[in-house]
Amino acid sequence: FRFDLASIMGRNEDGSPMSKPPILQSLAFDPILGRVKLIAEAWDAGGLYQVGSFPAWNRWSEWNGRFRDDLRCFLKGDYGMAQAAIERILGSADLYSPENRGENATVNFLNCHDGFTLYDMYAYNWKHNEKNGWNNTDGDNNNNSWNCGEEGESMNPEVLALRNRMRKNSFAVLMCSRGAAMFLAGDEFCNTQFGNNNAYCQDNEISWIDWSRKEQYSEMFEFCKFMIQLRKEHPILRGRSGPSGCGFPEVSVHNSKAWNAECNQDTHTIGVMFAGRNASNTEDDIIYIGVNTFWEYCDIELPKLPLGRKWKVLVNTEFEHTQDVDYDLLTRRKSDILLTMCPRSVLVARVEKYFE
C-alpha cells in the first residue's frame, strides 16, 4: 500500500507532529498487514516534510523526494549538486541510516503521477496547466525540468537528440541506484501530458496513456527493458552482496579521476563503483556508473583492475540503443581505463575476466 500525503496521519489533534503516531504504529505492527509493503509519501499539504524521518518502526518505506529533486538538478547540469547526487545513488544513507533502516527504506523515483512525465521533464521549462481551468495557477512551479533549448514539441534534430539522451540518462541512473526503483507508467515509451503537471482532473488524452507511442519510441522502450534486466542481473546494484574477492571496497566514489572522491561546486562528472558477489556467489560482481552532466566532452578514468580482468562497457547513452549494439566497441577509449564521455551522458561498465 502507498499512502498519499501520509504525514497527515502523524499529526496530533492540534496539528503538531507526533513522534509515535498511534495509527502509523498500528499499521506497522498489524498482523494481517505483516507481509504487506507500506510506502509513505512522507509529506502533507500542510508543509510537514518527513523524508528520512517518517515514523517507520523499520516497516515503512518512503517515496524519496530528495532523490527526485537532487538527481533532476544534477542531471540537467546545476552547480553544486554532485555530492547530493552521489548520496542518492548510494541509497541515501544520510537519510536512512544503514544501521536502522538502510536502502530498503528508500523508494527512488524521478517522476510519478504528480508532476511532469519523463518526456515532459525534458521538453518543458514551465508547467502548462491552462486546460485545468485555474489560469495555470495550479500545480507545482518547482519542477527542476529542462526543455533542452526549446519549449514544448520541437522539430530541431539536435534538441530531439539531446532530449532522448537526457531521458536515457535519467532512467539509467535510476536503475543503477541503491534502493527500490519506481518509474511512472508510460515513461518507458515517452508518454506525454503536453506539459500539464497536475493532470488529475483531466479524464482525456492529457492524462491517458497513449500506447501508440510504444511503437513511435520503440528505441527508448528497448533501452528501458535493457536497463531493468541489467538491474535484475546484478544484485550489487540493489544492495549488499558480500565482499568482492579482488579487494575493492563495496562502494567507492570517483570523479573524473579514479579513486579521487573530491567534489566541489563545479563538479559535473562522477563515478560510482559497486563491488561484491554475483547472485550465486561464484564470482565477483563489479559495476561502474559514470555520469557526465557537463556540456563538453570529458575524459573519465575507471579504476585499474587486477591482472586478468577488464572493463566492458554495457551502456553508453551517447549512442542509440538496439538489441545488438556493442557499446564497448563504440565507446571512445584512450586506454584500458581511460574513456571519453560525450556531453551529458551516462555509461555503465562491468568487470569481466579475460585470458590472453
Tell me what each language-model feature is:
Residues 160-168, 173-183, 187-356:
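Carbohydrate-interacting/catalytic domains
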Residues 17-18, 217:
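Short, conserved loop/turn and helix-capping segments at secondary-structure boundaries
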Residues 12, 20-185, 189, 198-202, ...:
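Conserved alpha/beta catalytic core and glycan-binding cleft of carbohydrate-active enzymes
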Residues 1-12:
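Active-site groove signature of glycoside hydrolases
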Residues 14-15, 51, 300-303:
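Short amphipathic alpha-helical segments
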